[in-house]
Amino acid sequence: MRITPPFGYEEVVPFLKTQKVCLLAAREVPGFAQRSNAIPISHTEFQLVAREYPIVFTGGDGKTFAPVAVLGLTAGENLFFAGGAWAPGVYVPAYARRYPFCMAKVTLDKAQQKDRLICIEKAFVDEQRGEAMFDAKGQPGAKWVEIERLLSEYEGDLERSREMCSIVADYGLLEPFTMQATLAKEKGGAAMHVTGMHRVSEKKLEDLNAAQLKNLLRKGVMARIYMHLLSLENFARLLERKAARPAAS
């Protein structure tokens, strides 16, 4: 059996009821997110994410896309990571809140299984310092009930995200773009170019036929398109966060 770790995870193993786990503190930032300038988001998160973060679409093959929240303006930079935790008053994406757990793809006998498996980052399994998620009778504790609900709801929401991205891509609505900005001279005057992003083209959106527009509305995609477009204004807020940091950072 081979388990494919999701983005940001190093080595994941199947989660067992008997394992003891080291959980992250509230608003603690997973190691991978401290060093990432983007993080995946899901369908129902758009409204909350759009308040603080730019939402863009990324796709390595140019055909399959996924929505992400932009966290920084340079590689390895999370401008919402401050004082060892997520910045106060800012929504924490579910992708970070579920860590160190995940739902991972499993390959068995060279065939990828349809169902995903609840897994955990191996480094967070600790029989000495960890805490049990189930009692001696195998009954789930309150924390595990909450974690399992998050995992289940998030996984279901990802399916809606994949459907949304498939529709947007099939309609040819996405176009690549680059965010360019320059810091003030007193902050070093560095020029920044954020690439690898796609956004919905308003011109292409206007060219859709009535049936396509109706489908976007029926599927709840149109609302998310507008949230995405409005969220792009948050690049200016990212630049403000960048400028507010000491020049040495």
Regions found by a protein language model. Give the residues of each.
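Short, basic/low-complexity N-terminal boundary segments at the transition from targeting/disordered tails
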Residues: 31-34, 74-79, 157-163
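Short, well-structured alpha-helical interface segments that form or flank functional binding sites
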Residues: 50, 91-94, 159, 200
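Aromatic- and glycine-enriched beta-alpha-beta binding-site module
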Residues: 58, 66-136
